[in-house]
Amino acid sequence: MAIKDLFNNFFLMDDEEEVESPEERQRRVVQNEENETNNVQQNQPQQSERSYSNQSKLKTVPQKKTTRNYNSEERNVRMNQPPSKSNGKNVVTMNQTSQSYSGYESSKMCLFEPRVFSDTQDIADELKNRRATLVNLQRIDKISAKRIIDFLSGTVYAIGGDIQRVGTDIFLCTPDNVEVAGSITDHIEQMESQHYE
């Protein structure tokens, strides 16, 4: 209830208040104006001293560099420029790559004679680099030779190449940029029959 009474009394006028006459009002206004002018004249020297001290303080404050406007202008320039052609094409299909490499990488062939299965990784790396490889497996046991051929068959299949037997335990592995023409299967069969006799 106290809050309600406070608000009710706030807007009410007491009957005992005197109503100012217009003459009294003018006298009071004139007095206020005179007091203000006197105060202003007395305070002017103090204000000038204050403003001088404020100015000296402002001189000691370092100025802030405006890097934000420069960055936003630079960003606007970059956004308004059309994209360059070099940035626009990041994806290259495998067919385009094979056409561009077919001229000079097909002339190199690597010869390998692995002694252990871990040497097969080097052969696979050469195939991935689009180089033909000739693998001689005559000096390795038959089980390891079979594992190596299985691994190389998977590698050649993954790169779209070919693997061919060209002799007794000798294989030619080629990537997709190398074409092998001709066949020597008859010659291989004759060599195998002589080898086992």
From Swiss-Prot:
Disulfide bonds: none annotated. Residues 48-58, 78-91 have a biased composition (Polar residues). GO terms for cellular component: cytoplasm. Residues 22-31 have a biased composition (Basic and acidic residues). Signal peptide: none annotated. Keywords: Cell cycle, Cell division, Cytoplasm, Septation. Residues 15-91 are annotated as: Disordered. Its main location: cytoplasm. Residues 37-47 have a biased composition (Low complexity). The keyword Cell cycle applies. One of its GO terms (biological process) is FtsZ-dependent cytokinesis. It is found in: Cytoplasm. Cell division protein that is part of the divisome complex and is recruited early to the Z-ring. Probably stimulates Z-ring formation, perhaps through the cross-linking of FtsZ protofilaments. Its function overlaps with FtsA. Belongs to the SepF family. Homodimer. Interacts with FtsZ. This is Cell division protein SepF. It comes from Staphylococcus haemolyticus (strain JCSC1435).
